[in-house]
Structures are given as C-alpha cells and as structure tokens.
Design a protein with these regions (language model features):
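Flexible acidic/glycine-rich loop/turn elements at helix↔coil and beta-strand↔loop transitions
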Residues: 30-36
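Short beta->alpha connector loops at strand-helix junctions that form conserved
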Residues: 111-114
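Structured binding elements
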Residues: 105
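Structural alpha-helical scaffold elements that stabilize or flank donor/cofactor-binding regions
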Residues: 30, 123-125
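Anion (oxyanion) recognition and catalysis
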Residues: 102
Length: 125
C-alpha cells in the first residue's frame, strides 16, 4: 500500500529530495565508507528504559546485528510484506529491529511504549 500520491512523489523526486534508495541501501553505503564509525548509541538513561548495559554499535556491527536478527525472524516465520507491530523504547535494539525488518521487506507499525494491552489489541484488529 502506498499512501503518497504519485504527483507528490514526482514533485520530490524531480527536486532530488526523494530517490530509489532504501533504508538498507543507506546502511550498506555507510558500511562501505565508514564501517568502524559509531552508528548508534544508547541514551544515557537506558537503565530507566530497559535492562542491560548501554550499547554502542558501529555501522559494521549494526549491519551484522540486523542480519543476524533478520535470520532469526525468518526462522520464526516472519516474511516479506508481512505486517509487524513493534513496541520498544528508544534504544539501540530498536534500530537493529528496524533494519532487520526492513531487510526482510516487512511493514513495520511502531507503537508508543505507553500503549497497554487495550490499545495494542484494538490496533491489531
């Protein structure tokens, strides 16, 4: 499903502000150019958001982590064009999930962490 009208797509493409590159294409380019540069860093208050020590991933590490998660997701039955709701705090693993799901061609529907069972149940119908 595309939600952007064709005329708007044409408008932005003609101005060079919208292209054919995907999220994963941008990651692959950074892995080629600067694999050891930091790509994503946990917030200082990670411990308030979730368990575990703060993480830092380079572009190469982010690519490898998202590849590994994508393979796990395939094993769990997640497939191309499937819709997945994702509810996570703003931590490194969220970025890994987005890239893994994008590599599989999955449609991601992010949910605010404040949503509880009622909201999630309603949205999943």
């Amino acid at each position: 499903m595309y939600t952007t009208p064709d005329h708007r797509i044409t408008h932005w493409v003609n101005r060079g502000l919208w292209g054919d590159r995907t999220l994963c294409d941008h990651l692959a380019l950074q892995v080629d150019i600067r694999p050891q540069q930091l790509a994503v860093i946990d917030p200082a208050n990670r411990i308030e958001l979730t368990q575990g020590d703060p993480l830092r991933l380079t572009y190469a590490e982010l690519d490898a982590a998202s590849d590994a998660l994508a393979l796990d997701l395939i094993d769990w039955g997640v497939s191309h064009r499937q819709r997945v709701m994702l509810q996570m705090p703003n931590v490194v693993e969220l970025v890994v999930c987005y890239f893994a799901l994008s590599k599989l061609g999955v449609v991601v529907s992010p949910l605010p962490v404040q949503y509880q069972a009622h909201e999630i149940s309603t949205l999943s119908k």
